[in-house]
Amino acid sequence: GTASGKTLCYNLPVLEALNADPNATALYLYPTKALAQDQQRKIRDLWPDLCFGTYDGDTPPTDRRKLKDRGRLLLTNPDMLSGSVLPHHDSFNRFFSNLKYVVIDEVHAYKGAFGSHVSIVLARLKRVAEKYGAKPQFIMTSATIRNPKELAEGLIKEPVSVVDNDGAPKGQKTFVLWNPPFDESKGVRLSANAEANRLFVSLIKKRVRTIAFVRARVTAELLYRYAVDELASYGLADKVRPYRGGYLPEDRRQIEQALFSGELLGVTSTNALELGIDIGGLDACIIVGYPGSVSSVWQQAGRAGRGRDESLVFLIANADPIDQFIVQHPDYFFAQSPERAVIDPDNPYILLGQLRAMAYELPLKKDEVAQLSENAPAVTELLAEGGQLVPRGNRFFWMAKGYPANDINLRNISENTYSIVEKLKDGNQAIGSIDELSAFTQLHPEAVYLHNGDTYLVRELDLEGKIAYIERADTDYFTQAVTERRVLIQEQRLGRPFNTATFGFGDLDVTFITYMFRKIKFYTRDSFGFGSIGLPPSTLETCGLWLEISPKEVSLVLKYGRDPREGLLGIGNVLASLMPLYILSDPGDVGSAVDSSNTGKPALFLFDRYRGGIGITEKAYEIMEEMLPNALDVIKECSCERGCPSCVGARRSRQDLLDPDASPRGKLPDKAAALIILHSILNLDEYVPPEEESETPWEVKPLSESTEKRLRQMLSQIKEKGR
């Protein structure tokens, strides 16, 4: 659990072993550089004379040489281990020869694509250690998840013992589940962001040290911008900062230090501050929207009231189905986490890069490749056919040019990362980076990009050079891209009937077409204009499950004048939103689409949003019978009449999740059609939708052509003023 003394549990035995054996070494792995640097200060207090340190991209060359020559304890992250340490293992031969312990902190962070990569990085670590005669013991720590043993054993491919007694000191923590009221006149729930801003500003004005966690980078910037505007008149504008991924390392360190020292009163942050970086004692935590897992809620809540201090935590529900499920079922929160962490080291796209790196480090033996995963031998043969490897007897040798570890991005499966470059009068300056799918939706020409509370206009997206060029511009609006999805089944791997419906699972091609963007006003969130996007379609090769309904469901829906596709779209929105309740994943890891082009019948698709898949929808395929009744409950329990973002409508993908309040204002997926379909495939009584008020016809006398023209000009001027 959070603040349960896990760090001390591994520091004491490891440091004792290093003290007993003057040659012994140990490796500490943290999911982020910031965590490693934070822990360095604590170890220095325990053993000032120990030769140790962080080994990451920020480590100066002189310190790197010292750690290679004399270092007893290295604190690093999987990215650095994969990209710099293992490929140069010969210069670390003393360290690896004496390696006694490997500590992996925050194991629950190693899920999905990241965890799938790290499992193979750890296999690379073990084979390098074996070359130098070492067989280190692994110690792992985790927040509460449902399957810690399964995840840990999946990562290191060895049996583990679980220790789960929590003896942490705990101060009183007041936990508030906050559901913004439903606005019947607009048919939507009031803004979670606006509620969060009101709370955040109120707490800062009372000088209550507060962190506000949000689910998207842009939302962190928006909340900060709103807060600064209100706090300026109180002389507190410089007492708050935003914090998120994409900032330069020195900027993040400066914010962390300002929080720790008490210089700052508040911070708006993505989950980048969720893990155990020591930012001092905060008094309050605002969680804007369910972050995707119970463990994340408690990790974020644990940033306030460390030790025995009292603290206040608000979880403000968004309109998403999962948020509404949580606030309607509060007992779920205070029970043991039901989520499973999933990794898939058999992903062929992950294996392609990792096997190249393995062969560069040491020749690949056929038996170790076969033990790595089911697809590893086939991918190895492909590498040999492509001239990357040369087979000799039972081994494969690296023969290609280059440095293959540089081609691996552990945090994603896409090799396409775009740099964000600000155009300045005296040259250009890189201010961040982003993956390709996000670049197409956030950095298209004319998009507004937010960074550190400032607004920038995107002037160019260089697809060949993978660079987005931006310029500083003061705007009173931000942008949100609109995408269309098409799904093609490449190969069906699994299938089974379910009452009148059919489940399937297999390999999919999902094509994303980003064709337009909205302009949305700050504060009011009104959409006041559109623009076209001329970017090429992008295709995601992944895996996913599908639900195909029978002619019976189609007939029932049509009988009531509804569209089956709109019903399936609503069911997909609910299922994708509820996914993190069952499988430890991030909001947006799973996408949904409705397509009838594969079989001629309407089908709902749920797919992993990573190349090759990461196992989420494969696990979901096994538990669909458990998920569908809960999806029905979410829709039935919602107080809306026709459908809203709290049940069937407007769930946002990772790319669309720029501002949770800027949901589409147009027609929502059909609640009644979703209920008709679910009642039928769950063998319940036929659902009869309530009669709706019929539209009253009226006679519209056309205006004269000249009058209509003048009125249109006036409206255009009014709209322009509103910008």
Segments (PLM) and residue ranges:
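Helicase motor core with emphasis on the C-terminal RecA-like subdomain
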Residues: 1-82, 86-363, 370-405, 414-415, ...
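Extended, highly charged accessory segments
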Residues: 137-140, 317, 359, 363-437, ...
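Conserved beta-strand residues within beta-sheet cores
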Residues: 159, 284, 455-457, 603
